[in-house]
């Protein structure tokens, strides 16, 4: 069982967007065969807040699309709270335009990206990236949001 707690203070998300986030999350938790009750927080923010967080925690002074803070410790979950994801709504919009695909696909991609980081996946090395992005594309496909080439 999983629960996503969505914090959207600026009311960027529609009900349809929230449903999509829950659908993507559910598919990941099914695909990863997670059994325990797991909760994660998703904070929908603007580019200004994204830039502040990116500068504070990554020492990079520009907005980023998604930042995850995992509470996993060496593959062990000490609490039901898996972690926190901060997602820039403005980046979802601009990157959907930039990559010439739908807002929904970009939202699904970035939510899945954040969740997989919470689960301990990374993309620093080529072999890690292949695994992580492969999982993301599989979830997008299962959710009807296209494949790797879309």
Swiss-Prot record:
It is found in: Cytoplasm. PROSITE patterns: UPF0054. GO terms for cellular component: cytoplasm. GO terms for molecular function: metalloendopeptidase activity; RNA endonuclease activity; zinc ion binding. Keywords: Cytoplasm, Endonuclease, Hydrolase, Metal-binding, Nuclease, Ribosome biogenesis, rRNA processing, Zinc. Zn(2+) binds at residues 113, 117, 123. GO terms for biological process: rRNA processing. Binds 1 zinc ion. Signal peptide: none annotated. Its main location: cytoplasm. InterPro entries: MetalPrtase_cat_dom_sf_prd, YbeY, YbeY_CS. Its cofactor is Zn(2+). Its EC number is 3.1.-.-. Belongs to the endoribonuclease YbeY family. NCBIfam families: rRNA maturation RNase YbeY. Single strand-specific metallo-endoribonuclease involved in late-stage 70S ribosome quality control and in maturation of the 3' terminus of the 16S rRNA. This is Endoribonuclease YbeY. It comes from Malacoplasma penetrans (strain HF-2) (Mycoplasma penetrans). The lineage of its organism: Bacteria, Bacillati, Mycoplasmatota, Mycoplasmoidales, Mycoplasmoidaceae. The gene is ybeY.
């Amino acid at each position: 069982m999983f629960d996503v707690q969505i914090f959207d203070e600026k009311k960027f998300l529609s009900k349809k967007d929230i449903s999509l986030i829950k659908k993507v999350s559910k598919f990941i938790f099914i695909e990863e065969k997670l059994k325990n009750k797991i909760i994660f927080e998703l904070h929908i923010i603007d580019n200004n807040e994204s830039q502040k967080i990116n500068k504070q925690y990554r020492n990079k002074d520009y907005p980023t699309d998604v930042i995850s803070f995992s509470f996993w410790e060496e593959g062990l979950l000490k609490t039901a709270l898996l972690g926190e994801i901060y997602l820039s709504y403005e980046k979802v919009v601009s990157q959907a335009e930039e990559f010439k695909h739908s807002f929904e696909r970009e939202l699904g991609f970035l939510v899945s990206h954040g969740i997989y980081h919470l689960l301990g996946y990374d993309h620093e090395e080529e072999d890690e990236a292949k695994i992580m992005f492969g999982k993301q594309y599989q979830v997008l496909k299962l959710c009807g949001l296209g494949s790797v080439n879309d």
